[in-house]
């Protein structure tokens, strides 16, 4: 969080999220710095938009946002499980050890959905996968 970097291949989980300051108890919006820069530069930044996204809503549902922005700023929950697996597989071919990559499912995912992700990972020669089911 300090340097806004990652050693992994995870896509951004959220463009905006809330965090409570332990010193004064205030809740602050943390905004992806690249998204914020584009929002300000192209005139669609607003605190209302940041609060809307921090509540877990998708940028794809917001009217008035340029399509190119919506196409760039896709978050992990919006990516299909198969695409998560294929992203991991693309890296796995060049790495001898296992790769840490979370396969995100929404709350309605079934046991069969998870099984299909595991089978795709096996077919693509991934060394393992991690599954996260929202909610």
How would you label these PLM feature ranges?
Residues 1-135:
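Catalytic alpha/beta core of large soluble enzyme barrels
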